[in-house]
């Protein structure tokens, strides 16, 4: 046990985040005419400083790669500290998840500039709510009891309600943001009731809400498992499946994505998914030790999530449906793999799940950046063509205003380099050999298979889902190389000239290629030492 006064270094990023929330709220209240770009620059600066707060732990992370070039570094990750009567816990894994969600938030902020700057006076609300939701994510990562975890989840969720609704504009494409926010609020409150009921049953049976105490009880078999405990565990984890958009609470994800801004969808598919995975690992490692009922329930949820998510994605791609619907269904299907690894509650399977989550985030950011660039250019073209002859002669508005997957047809003819980068991201999602997605799936499946003979059955569902993923990802690739019917329209479309997004997509594509060959082993070594 250490006192907080002697351990400020572990909370540098937290202090910067709290200061950022206060500063952004103060600027929003007292500096009314500040341009939107300065609010976004402030947000990016705060997030960058938060990332710098993790530098003291970098040597320890590099040391754990077991690479010779880092062998002389001094590790700074051998600790397990608790604060505030055991309600807060600092471990290497907790710090890693804090770093991961901060990095995801920073990338989301950078990619969202073109979609957020139109908020004008409401931009200060966006920056404040964005940081408050991140504060809730931090609380989830360092929580060590159910009450701290629940309060942190609610802070994140309440901020997200208003964050979604802040884009409401009945004249714009995000006119359904208010409806999406209300839907998310109602369903989330139902899930919160399940979570509280589950926590009460767990406390009634075990007499504690502290994760460390529960883990001690489970390992030493001090108290037997009871039906009441099983019900409490299932209710609690059902509520968590809502937070990550897994079966049976996954429909909200598509509604929220469809009605909200692209930046909100990216935030949910990256930061919220990562926070949900951290909560599942944190609580599952304690409660999963009692019996196999919880493990079976989560495996069932994961298998159904995998199949449903990929079936929905395949149907959307076949019909050339809405881009946001496809991104939502892809998010649902990929979180199923993460949940499947966590559900077995073994060190190797959890390590494989976290590695898959990292690869998913890289692929996800690359794909979202690509689609956001396509949509931005698409909206510019429609805006410019509304009073020109191209709308009349070629039906530009009719063809592209829906922002569906058909909008990427012929992209390879406009920018072959851009199309190649998108292909790399899609191949990783499909699990194509030599790509990081293939390495992550292979490592996940092999570790699940070692869990026992019954692990074969969930892998059959995962294999079927992977086949579906290959189908629809290759279908999207084929769209980009299809020659458009009206080539004149594409010639008039603006060139993909956003250099910063190009560089970002190139970086993500390079990571996916390099990770498939070289980076997988060092990253897995780090994760093995964390768990």
Q: Could you describe each region identified by the protein language model?
A:
Residues 1-531:
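Alpha-helical transmembrane segments of multi-pass membrane proteins predominantly involved
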